C-alpha cells in the first residue's frame, strides 16, 4: 500500500527537497505552504512527475486553528497519515541578543515551537495505535543552533529549536508504545533561502572555516537524512537527534 506523507513548510528549501525525494521513494505527499502558492505548486508538479499523488495545502503553522484545518484537509485528500515532517520554521534578521524584542521572539516561537508542537499533536492523534491509528513516523526539524546557541545572530531561533529537541525526546518516550517513532534532524549551515532571511547573503560561506568538511550542506543531503528516518532502515531508532552538519559542533 502506498504511504502518505505531510510536510509543513514544503514550498522551498529542505521541505521542498524532502517532498521531491519522498516521491522518488514512492510516497504520496501533501505540500504545506504559508504564502507562496506558486512555489508549492511547482513542488507538487515535481512530485506528480515522479508518478505520485500530491496536493498543496495552505496553512500558516504559526496559527493553531490553521494547523487544525491543515490536517482536516489532509484527511479529506489522503486519509491515513504514515509520515509527518514537522519542518516549517522561520529565521529573522541577524541581531545581537540585547537587541531582540519580545515581539520578534514571539513570532519565532509561534511558528518554530508552538506551531510545531500543535502540528505534532495532530499527527500523533492520527497515528497512535492507542487511538485507533496504524502507527507512523514523525521527523521534527531542529537545527544545529539548538546546541551551538546562535550567538551574535539568532539566539531566539536557537532557543526555539532547543525546545524541539526536548519535545522530540519526550514524544519518542511517550509514543513508542503507540506505534510511533519520533526523531529529529539538526541541519547545520545548509545553502537554502532561509539563510538569506538573516540579511547575510554569504552566511553559509562565512561559516565554512568552522565546518570540518569545509563546505556548506545541501537541502538534498538533509532530505536524505529525513527519508532514512522515515524508512524501515531506521526501524529501531526513536528519540534520535541526527546532526547533518559536516561535522560542525563536534
Language-model features: where?
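Conserved glycine-rich cofactor-binding loop
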Residues: 11-12
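Short, small/polar-rich loop/turn modules that mediate ligand/substrate recognition or access, typified
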Residues: 80, 176, 181, 237-239
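Active-site helix of classical SDR
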Residues: 120, 160
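Short C-terminal tail/terminal secondary-structure segment
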Residues: 94, 148, 209, 227, ...
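Alpha-helical segment proximal to the catalytic Tyr-Lys
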Residues: 125, 129, 173-174, 235
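Substrate-binding pocket helix/loop in short-chain dehydrogenase/reductase
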Residues: 95-97, 101-107, 207
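Residue(s) in the substrate-gating loop at a strand-loop-helix junction
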Residues: 143
Amino acid at each position: 500500500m502506498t504511504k502518505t506523507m505531510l510536510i509543513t513548510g514544503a514550498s522551498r528549501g529542505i521541505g521542498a527537497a524532502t517532498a521531491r525525494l519522498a516521491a522518488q521513494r514512492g510516497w504520496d505527499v501533501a505540500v504545506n505552504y504559508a504564502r507562496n502558492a506558486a512555489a508549492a505548486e511547482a513542488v507538487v508538479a515535481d512530485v506528480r512527475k515522479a508518478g505520485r499523488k500530491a496536493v498543496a495545502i495552505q496553512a500558516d503553522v504559526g496559527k493553531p486553528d490553521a494547523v487544525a484545518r491543515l490536517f482536516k484537509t489532509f484527511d479529506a485528500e489522503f486519509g491515513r497519515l504514515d509520515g509527518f515532517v514537522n519542518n516549517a520554521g522561520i529565521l529573522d534578521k541577524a541581531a545581537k541578543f540585547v537587541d531582540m524584542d519580545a515581539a520578534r521572539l514571539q513570532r519565532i516561537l509561534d511558528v518554530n515551537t508552538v506551531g510545531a508542537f500543535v502540528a505534532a499533536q495532530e499527527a500523533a492523534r492520527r497515528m497512535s495505535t492507542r487511538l485507533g491509528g496504524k502507527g507512523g513516523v514523525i521527523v521534527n526539524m531542529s537545527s544545529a543552533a539548538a546546541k551551538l546557541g546562535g550567538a551574535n545572530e539568532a539566539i531566539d531561533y536557537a532557543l526555539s529549536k532547543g525546545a524541539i529537541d526536548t519535545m522530540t525526546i519526550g514524544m519518542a518516550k511517550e509514543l513508542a508504545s503507540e506505534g510511533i517513532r519520533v526523531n529529529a534532524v539538526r541541519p547545520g549551515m545548509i545553502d537554502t533561502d532561509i539563510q538569506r532571511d538573516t540579511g547575510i547573503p554569504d552566511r553559509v560561506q562565512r561559516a565554512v572555516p568552522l565546518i570540518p568538511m569545509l563546505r556548506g550542506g545541501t537541502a538534498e543531503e538533509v532530505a536524505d537524512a529525513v527519508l532514512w528516518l522515515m524508512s524501515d532502515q531506521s526501524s529501531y531508532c526513536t528519540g534520535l537527534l541526527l546532526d547533518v552538519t559536516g561535522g560542525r559542533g563536534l
